[in-house]
Amino acid sequence: MSRTIFCTFLKKDAERQDFQLYPGEIGKRIYNEISKEAWSQWITKQTMLINEKKLSMMNIEDRKLLEQEMVNFLFEGQDVHIAGYTPPSK
């Protein structure tokens, strides 16, 4: 059974995560405040960041950068900026 939460990213009620997807306090906050839809948007941005900046998840500095970008995107309202990328026009 799905549960609805108020998603702080989307600023509306939406379906919550099925389980905590990220460890620690940030993970708890994501589980309680970020919907499946918002998480999906983050995963798309994360994939772009990893590919374009050639990040390695084996490198602790790359993981820290990705975590900071995630917090900025999900909780601070800052979009992910990738040099040379222009979003498609709607």
Swiss-Prot record:
> Among its keywords, does the record have Iron?
yes
For this protein, the record's SUPFAM superfamilies field holds:
YggX-like
What InterPro entries does the entry give? Answer: Fe_traffick_prot_YggX, Fe_traffick_prot_YggX_sf
Q: What is an example of a Pfam family matching this protein?
A: Iron_traffic
Ordered alphabetically, the record's keywords are: Iron
One GO term (biological process): cellular response to oxidative stress
Task: Name the GO cellular-component terms.
Answer: cytosol
Q: Does the keyword Mitochondrion apply?
A: no
GO molecular function ontology, one term from the record: iron ion binding
Stored HAMAP family: Fe_traffic_YggX
Its subunit composition reads: Monomer.
Record family assignment: Belongs to the Fe(2+)-trafficking protein family.
Its annotated function is as follows:
Could be a mediator in iron transactions between iron acquisition and iron-requiring processes, such as synthesis and/or repair of Fe-S clusters in biosynthetic enzymes.
Q: What is this protein called?
A: Probable Fe(2+)-trafficking protein
